[in-house]
Amino acid sequence: MSAQLINGKEVSQKRLQAVAEAVAQRQQDNLHMPCLAVVLVGGDPASAVYVRNKKTACQKCGIKSLSYELPESTSQEELLALVDRLNADSEVDGILVQLPLPKHLDSQAVLERISPDKDVDGFHPYNVGRLAVKMPLMRPCTPKGVMTLLEAYGIDPKGKKAVVVGASNIVGRPQALELLLARATVTVCHSATENLTDEVAGADILVVGVGIPNFVKGEWIKPGAVVIDVGINRLDDGSLCGDVEFETAKERAAMITPVPGGVGPMTIATLMENTLHAASLHDA
């Protein structure tokens, strides 16, 4: 039996439509138009594509977008000065610095310079900390997008065994906090985890984000599990694949996200939701 596909494109379009309707209502109520500032440093082709996708989503939602494309040679001081200006600009609701930054720049210092109420990526330690103490403000986009997908497909994590493979600051750690908030019993696996196959085999809900093509094998997966593949990897032939061996996994899982078309669209939809939320925080 083949798994039901979890369609992130479809769910994300509904969420974007809801944001667009909320933005239109704000205009009727004479509230300011939400505004997202996106900063891109250097010429990384993948980053340029991601930034373009975010601009397109802003247009669909009626969110104003400002774009700052800086040369590879930009210094730490110059980048921090731009963040300071955007923090001080009352018209800007959200600030996004596209990662990865060139190697000579300190990404963590830049992320921590963004005002937490404008941190629409949800990466600032303040926002991760609020999520940890069950008081979320700006929630990291990919983990929150995963939770939205689960909700859309009627999957309640409460009481389930959830296993997160990968412990990055962007996906794995905040994903574990999101699942904990939803009252799942959460295990996080990382490079020092022993018996990874056993951990995966016990998962009712499996979320994988390690950036290694086909890392999790289909035969490891518990029959009837829900599999969320956050990975997106480009192979030598130009095709995209996730971190889970899709063809074998779909024969065991009850539901699974495809790559592409699963989690990716949800990340951008959540970014738009966060920008709208930031605008509402700035209304007062």
Curated annotation (Swiss-Prot):
One of the record's GO cellular component terms: cytosol
Residues that coordinate or bind NADP(+): G166, A167, S168, S191, I232
SUPFAM superfamilies xrefs: Aminoacid dehydrogenase-like, N-terminal domain, NAD(P)-binding Rossmann-fold domains
Highest taxon of source: Bacteria
InterPro entries the UniProt entry points to: Aminoacid_DH-like_N_sf (IPR046346), NAD(P)-bd_dom_sf (IPR036291), THF_DH/CycHdrlase (IPR000672), THF_DH/CycHdrlase_cat_dom (IPR020630), THF_DH/CycHdrlase_CS (IPR020867), THF_DH/CycHdrlase_NAD-bd_dom (IPR020631)
Oxidoreductase keyword on record: yes
The protein's assembly and partners: Homodimer.
Listed NCBIfam families: PRK10792.1, PRK14186.1
Function: Catalyzes the oxidation of 5,10-methylenetetrahydrofolate to 5,10-methenyltetrahydrofolate and then the hydrolysis of 5,10-methenyltetrahydrofolate to 10-formyltetrahydrofolate.
Record protein name field: Bifunctional protein FolD
Source organism of the structure: Neisseria meningitidis serogroup A / serotype 4A (strain DSM 15465 / Z2491)
